[in-house]
Amino acid sequence: MGTGKKEKSRIQRQGKVTGDPKVKGENFYRSAKKIKALNVLKEGKAIRNKEGKVVKAASYQSRDVPTAVIEPNRRWFNNTRVISQDTLTSFREAIAEKDKDPYSVLLKSNKLPMSLIRDGPKDALKKHQAKMTIESEPFSQTFGPKAQRKRPKLSFNTIGDLTEHSEKSMDTYQARLEEIKLLSGASGYGGGLADDDVQEEDFSVATAKEAIFTKGQSKRIWNELYKVIDSSDVILHVIDARDPLGTRCRHVEKYLATEAPHKHLIFVLNKIDLVPSKTAAAWIRVLQKDHPTCAMRSSIKNPFGRGSLIDLLRQFSILHKDRKQISVGLVGYPNVGKSSIINALRGKPVAKVAPIPGETKVWQYVTLMRRIYLIDCPGIVPPNQNDTPQDLLLRGVVRVENVDNPEQYIPAVLNKVKPHHMERTYELKGWKDHIHFLEMLARKGGRLLKGGEPDVDGVAKMVLNDFMRGKIPWFTPAPEKEEGETDTMEGREGRYGEMSKKRKRDEDDSAPATTPASAGEDAKEEDPENFAGFDSDSDSEVEEAAEEKGEEKSTAEDMIPLDASSDEEEDGEEEGSDVEDDEEGSDLDIEGASELEESESEAEAAPAPPPKKQRRSRK
């Protein structure tokens, strides 16, 4: 072991240098770091000899390309996935037909360019060209003193095209007038306004409304709505059976169709006990053409449609087997019965309800089963310029006690309700106008102010509350069918648009399984002209129909129990027993119940006889 210079030389010779190796060009003036930086700058230049020829090319300068070899694969010489235009058109038509069916659910999609199938309408190219024409050639440069062309470019080449376009515009205009007639109650089974009395829509500036009529349109309410929609897999759109078109939220339907087409939308026609069965069945047939529709009477002790709705939710939970649970959100106008439906499904009061709008402030989760959760949402009121204050008030959007001058809305009530219904409800006759009617009602009830003057404001609020809470019978009739149009869908010929019952085996195969219920059953029903409404103490048509068919009110055999499948509640047998104890009434629209199952359930429910004692023989 040497020291000093000899030892350093030996370590370098054996390659045991601990520090950085010496870089070429490193000296006292240039460190290794500086030399590396200079080499980076020199790297982009080629090295040439004294004759100027490139001896060593710079980085990425060489033009010598290595020989490329194609992978020997047979797929290079086969045809690609091609499809003809005729096949694509037929496939597009088949997909469009299935999309229109509200009872079809897409379970799995193939690896196809769906943009080629779900393209825009046929006139999408014309609309795009018209948009580009307007942007490139504005109106001021085409018409007027600054016009730069003699003849404007029109989208119609012939008079026939112009006539066809005019007819389509006229049909759209007539459809809008028909919708106005339906909303005003001037169409349907007789009565109402004539065609000449329906005024056309004017585009004048709307006057200022009271602040109370902006309820349900705040940013907080819409945030709650979008939170419920984003958190839900199935959306239950609750609609009032007395005014289905007025309480139908088109904004939610359009939002789900464009932004969330994977979510399922279901219409729930609530409060069907306040309308005739014929009218409820007609509205269900109309609404089920767009989305699946269920009829519901939200009552804890005596519900109607509860079993069918639970069965439908179970079907959606089966469709989404990959998820641990599904969430069902209830949306709709205020005071249509969203929280009441949750209580009816659970069989006990779990959500706060009240006969006034705006009781639900924020969204809340409620457990229905182990795999199904319910989400309650505050009521929303989509802004619409055509909605007048009286329309919003009669839909139950605002609270009557907060409205100024309530007597000004009584004429709208008298227009919607037939005179004999008002006479039968309040036992009054012979009023001249709405003020005279309120004075007569106030004097009859003893509601007088100082000096013997009738309390018109108080009586008007009472009448409005009776109108919204169902004490005054009224309903909007369904639109009449056109000639040659059928209101029943294929495979759903039941009374309320449900599927046909299981036909008996002893019937002939050639005989039809069911017949449309609109001809036979509707003839026995009460005429809507003579409809007098239902009191809280009297039985409704739903209960009377159940009694005619021999079904008991207090039995739960025709109800679908919550613990019938693996979807049990989290609380186990305790909550299941509570729901079963509260189940009363009958469900007429439950499908698939056979006579054998009913006989077996009756045999199980009947107590077993005591065993007979055997006598022993004495020997």
Curated annotation (Swiss-Prot):
InterPro entries: G_CP_dom, GNL2_CP_dom, GTP-bd, GTP-bd_ortho_bundle_sf, NOG2_N_dom, P-loop_NTPase, TRAFAC_YlqF/YawG_RiboMat
Subcellular localization, as worded in the UniProt entry: Nucleus, Nucleolus
Gene Ontology CC, one term: nucleolus
Biased composition (Acidic residues): 536-546, 565-603
Skewed-composition ranges (Basic and acidic residues): 1-10, 489-500, 547-556
Pfam families: MMR_HSR1, NGP1NT
Residues that hold GTP according to the record: G332, Y333, P334, N335, V336, G337, K338, S339, D376, C377, P378, G379, I380
GO biological process: ribosome biogenesis
Keyword DNA repair annotated: no
Database matches in Gene3D superfamilies: 1.10.1580.10, P-loop containing nucleotide triphosphate hydrolases (3.40.50.300)
Domain CP-type G: from-to ranges: 222-383
One annotated GO molecular function: GTP binding
Record's keyword annotation contains Nucleotide-binding: yes
UniProt keyword list: GTP-binding, Nucleotide-binding, Nucleus, Ribosome biogenesis
Region (Disordered): 1-24, 473-619
Main location group: nucleus
Cross-referenced PANTHER family: GTP-BINDING PROTEIN-RELATED, NUCLEOLAR GTP-BINDING PROTEIN 2
Function: GTPase that associates with pre-60S ribosomal subunits in the nucleolus and is required for their nuclear export and maturation.
Family: Belongs to the TRAFAC class YlqF/YawG GTPase family. NOG2 subfamily.
Protein name, as recorded: Nucleolar GTP-binding protein 2
